[in-house]
């Protein structure tokens, strides 16, 4: 299995890149684009060389306002916060062209939109973020903010969404994450977590999370790890599985003062 990643920058002029919110949502950068087809339905297209991706995504659950009605504090100061909106359950169908072969693809996607004035507070060096689709129809998003002394910041938080769509906000004391294994990057020499046990005692949720591919490090403008994971565990004593995405920053270098 291979992991591929790309990065582009462009000025928002001459039609090269841009975004609209009305009358419908659209954002594009050259031939990478996401456009709204109808209420809750989006068309995603991207091309890199001879490879391309063409997907239709349908929001079957609706938006989730993370944190305090969409306001997500990341530290004690007023500026250390973000506005954070998710669409965690997007039914996805489409086509993928890779190495000259076309594939039909389907599954579930998760869209996050987060924007802020500052990513980290003083003393914070990075974050670990998890977004998981579970086989019982529930979803889990949690993130931990790591401090220079190795401790977890109390502003770490998350959201658990039941199979019937009820949302539960999680504070830092509501979940536990233990690193079970690590992986050292041959490119950056950063040492990343590579397996986790994640527990949410309030909903009797116990999960084991492992990457699909060990090397999902992105060596771009910022060096960090972000990639696909698979999940096994239990809720209320019943077995479940799942898939998701994990983002790990601050392991190759501190993210402090990077934004």
Where are the language model's segments positioned?
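Targeting-peptide/extracellular-domain and disordered-appendage signature
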Residues: 1-259
